[in-house]
A protein has these predicted regions:
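Loop-helix junctions at membrane interfaces
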Residues: 1-213
Length: 213
C-alpha cells in the first residue's frame, strides 16, 4: 500500500474540488445522463495508489453532500471503489496505453454500476436526484421493477461514464510534465514512457568512432 506523500496530500483537495464542480454542473445544472464526477479520484488513485484514491472518492461525496444537501453521500462507497480500482490499475501499469486505460474504465464502470444500482434501488427507492433519473424512469416503465430499473440504468450509464473519465485522465496525464508525475508514489507506472532520442551520425561518431570506408 502506497504512503501518502506531501505531493499526494496537496493534490487530494484539488481533486475533490474538481470532482464536485464537474459533477454538480453535469448532474444538477445540466441534468445530463452522466456523472463525470470522478476524474479527480481517478487522477489521485492512479498516481498515488488505491488508499489515496479511495479516500479522495469518499471525501468528495461526503463534502458534496454537506455543501449541496445532495444524495452524493449515499454513493460514497462507489466513489471510493472507483479510486481503489484506479489505484490498482495504475499499479499494474494498465494506464500507460490508451487501449488498456479504456478497458480499465469500462471494467470500473461495470463494478461501480452494480454497487450503485443496488444502493439506488434499496436505499433511495430508485431516485438519485440527478440527470440519470429519466433513464431509470424509462426502465421502470418498461419492466415495472425498481431494482431492475436501477441496475439497468447504472449498467447503461456507468461503463460509458467511467470510460470517458479514464480516457480524459489518459490525455490529462500527457499534458503534465513527467518530472512532476514521477514524484508521486505510482507516477513512474502511470507517466508516459520516456522516448530515447534518435542516434544521429554526430552521436555515432562521438561515442563509437568514425565509420570505416
Amino acid at each position: 500500500m502506497k504512503r501518502l506523500n506531501t505531493l499526494t496530500i496537496a493534490l487530494m483537495p484539488i481533486a475533490i474540488v474538481l470532482n464536485i464542480v464537474i459533477g454538480y454542473l453535469v448532474g444538477t445544472v445540466l441534468k445530463l445522463p452522466l456523472y463525470l464526477d470522478s476524474l479527480g479520484t481517478i487522477l489521485v488513485g492512479a498516481l498515488a495508489g488505491p488508499l489515496a484514491g479511495g479516500v479522495t472518492g469518499l471525501l468528495s461525496n461526503v463534502i458534496w453532500t454537506l455543501i449541496t444537501s445532495s444524495t452524493a453521500s449515499w454513493f460514497a462507497v462507489v466513489a471510493a471503489l472507483v479510486g481503489v480500482m484506479a489505484g490498482i490499475f495504475g499499479a499494474r501499469g494498465w494506464l500507460q496505453g490508451l487501449g488498456r486505460t479504456a478497458l480499465a474504465g469500462i471494467l470500473t464502470g461495470i463494478v461501480a454500476a452494480i454497487v450503485a444500482g443496488l444502493i439506488q434501488a434499496f436505499l433511495l427507492g430508485g431516485i438519485s436526484g440527478g440527470g440519470t433519473d429519466a433513464l431509470t424512469a424509462f426502465y421502470l416503465n418498461q419492466f415495472g421493477d425498481p431494482t431492475v430499473a436501477s441496475l439497468l440504468q447504472s449498467l447503461t450509464v456507468d461503463p460509458i461514464d467511467k470510460l470517458i473519465q479514464f480516457v480524459a485522465f489518459f490525455f490529462l496525464i500527457r499534458s503534465l510534465p513527467r518530472r512532476l508525475l514521477v514524484r508521486f508514489p505510482q507516477g513512474k507506472l502511470v507517466a508516459p514512457p520516456m522516448v530515447a532520442p534518435p542516434i544521429t551520425d554526430a552521436y555515432h561518431k562521438r561515442t563509437i568512432g568514425p565509420k570505416e570506408d
